[in-house]
UniProtKB/Swiss-Prot annotation:
Record's protein name: Peptide deformylase
Catalytic activity, reaction form: N-terminal N-formyl-L-methionyl-[peptide] + H2O = N-terminal L-methionyl-[peptide] + formate
Alphabetized GO MF terms: metal ion binding; peptide deformylase activity
Active-site residues, Swiss-Prot/TrEMBL: E134
Function: Removes the formyl group from the N-terminal Met of newly synthesized proteins. Requires at least a dipeptide for an efficient rate of reaction. N-terminal L-methionine is a prerequisite for activity but the enzyme has broad specificity at other positions.
Pfam families: Pep_deformylase (PF01327)
Source organism per UniProt: Histophilus somni (strain 129Pt)
Enzyme class: hydrolase
Amino acid sequence: MALLNVLIYPDERLKTVAEPVSVFDEELQTFIDNMFETMYHEEGIGLAATQVNVHKRIITIDIEGTKENQIVLINPEILESFGETGIEEGCLSLPGLRGFVPRKETVKVKAQNRQGEDFMLDADGLLAICIQHEIDHLNGIVFADHLSPLKRQRMKEKLLKLQKQIAKNR
């Protein structure tokens, strides 16, 4: 397995809308494994393929981080959503930054698994929030896009400053 490079906001590639997956081969399986490895290495609970510059509709999730309840959603689609909730969200593409995003409390999702088989998933709480967050990525949206223009600009400035510091220390 290999670690993948996570794109950092405001990288324009994060705005790319992902294409559906149609081939479920060994290359896809390896890529999904690499997504999980990257997600765990970065201490995330979810990762969208768009975040690693692969613009396919693939999401990996492990809310507990135990590797025992891994969820793979390929070509996910929210069919129903109910209730109102929200938390201070973080994102591997916006390291160290958080922002409150209103979300639906419960979602019903249609997706495909690693083998291309269709399934339905009913999710609530943190899992529902994570699914919505990751599907946003597949649609070219980062959580900062849900914030006010002023907060979004401050986030960009902080991340650009951080990137300059990292580049300087190399």
